[in-house]
């Protein structure tokens, strides 16, 4: 995974984390986002919520640390020909490799508005999935093991009706917009080719 990065997106310094304002990713535009907060709802083995851009990579790295090896990385890219997504996988990763992917590509993955990505465990199917408009989903057999991570990052665990997302702000007068972004001369569309030599492939 050749290439440079400007900072460690997995850094967990509290000074870098505990911010009061909800921030949008570069590829996401919705009016009124400052009203939101990073939060999630836990129901059984499933967690869903919305995250401020500044902590998305830290959540990804924190969950990766708790996934059982081997780990897989997946990336969904828009496919205009099929009006859907092309999905790419990189299987059988160690935690070190999964974290290296975030360190190398985390900035563009998090800030891009049109793609979706995540990491999961081949061993027990636990998974984190980042979707449109800064929402995320986690499947975990033991959600309690993530409570310390959520608390440290300032993610409120709330009732289902209390999860307010960017989608809730979108209407005829406040239309949302997502776009592809570039970081260090690369976009998310470069990732499958860059990782092809490591074994990344397109799902059939």
What kind of region is each of these model predictions?
Residues 44-126:
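Surface-exposed, low-hydrophobicity interaction/linker segments
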Residues 29-38, 72-81, 165-167:
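Short, compositionally biased low-complexity segments
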